[in-house]
Every structure is written in structure tokens, then in C-alpha cells.
Regions:
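Active-site-proximal, glycine-rich beta->alpha crossover segments in alpha/beta enzymes
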Residues: 1-15
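Short amphipathic alpha-helical segments
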Residues: 9, 13, 62, 120-124
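Short, structured coil/loop segments at alpha-helix boundaries
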Residues: 1-3, 59-63, 143
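His/Asp/Glu-rich mid-to-C-terminal helical/loop segments that flank catalytic regions of hydrolases
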Residues: 116-152
Length: 152
């Protein structure tokens, strides 16, 4: 079962990302890697105290845009800086595809109870898309820039 899932999903997922990165790189273009996940509202019987987590390693280009956007426009939200998890993990999607290729990146975590219903899903999809759309022509995001990883 494990080997089947690795071959059917994990390998296909990572190979497609690598294929797209290489396609763009061959044209001297660089991507920004944006990974979106959700996290449970409780961990070890404790309520998690953040709404959205911004995870990053050592490239601050995209995280800075998101932190500034939320600070300016959505002070009611509790934003975690490398919470509820660390963005400094070797061999995750960000490390493997963005950090190792010098691509700007961010991993966004949304608390699951906020996106259970369609209205929450639509709200957070629009919310997360706004800083990206505002910065779609920001050339600094689409340049290769190698930052040494802080991943352990």
C-alpha cells in the first residue's frame, strides 16, 4: 500500500512540479512556489491560537508581502510566523523545489474549522489570492535568489 501511494501520488506530484520548474527555467523564467495546506484546530487537546500560518525558510520575499497585507488589511486575524509548524524542514515541497532552486516561496496553513463550509472556503481563497494578485507583476518574486536554508 505504501509503495503504491508513493508511486501513484507522491512521485507524480513532485515530478510534475519539477517538470514545470525545468520548463520555465529553460526559458529563463522563474516561478514562485505557493503551497496551501490546512491544520487541525486542536493539537494534543489544546486549541490552536492562530487562524493562518505563514511558513517559510530563509527567503522572505513572499512571507513579507503576506505579513504586511494581513497587518494592513486584516488585523482581526491571528497570523502565525512559522506556526503551527516550521517552514524550515528538509525534503518538504518548499525545501525540495523552491529553496534548492532559488525560487520565492511560501507555505500557507489555514485552520480547518475556518474552511469547513463553502463560505469560509470562498473567503479564504479570495483572501489568500489578494496579495498574490496585487504582486503578480513584482519582478523580485520571479527572480532566482539563493538563500541558505535554515532547515534542520
Amino acid at each position: 500500500e505504501k509503495d503504491y501511494r508513493i508511486e501513484k501520488y507522491y512521485d507524480v506530484y513532485h515530478n510534475k512540479i519539477l517538470e514545470l520548474i525545468n520548463l520555465k527555467k529553460n526559458k529563463k523564467k522563474y516561478l514562485a512556489i505557493i503551497s496551501i495546506h490546512s491544520f487541525t484546530p486542536f493539537w494534543q487537546n489544546k486549541k490552536r491560537d492562530i487562524d493562518i500560518g505563514i511558513l517559510w525558510d530563509n527567503d522572505y520575499r513572499l512571507p513579507e508581502i503576506f505579513f504586511n497585507f494581513f497587518l494592513k488589511n486584516h488585523r482581526e486575524l491571528i497570523i502565525g510566523d512559522n506556526k503551527p509548524y516550521s517552514g524550515r524542514l528538509k525534503n518538504d515541497t518548499i525545501y525540495k523545489h523552491a529553496t534548492m532552486n532559488g525560487l520565492s516561496n511560501i507555505l500557507i496553513e489555514i485552520r480547518q474549522d475556518l474552511i469547513l463550509e463553502k463560505t469560509g472556503q470562498e473567503f479564504y481563497a479570495k483572501l489568500i489570492s489578494r496579495p498574490l494578485l496585487i504582486n503578480k507583476d513584482n519582478s523580485a518574486l520571479f527572480k532566482q535568489s539563493f538563500c541558505s536554508s535554515l532547515a534542520l
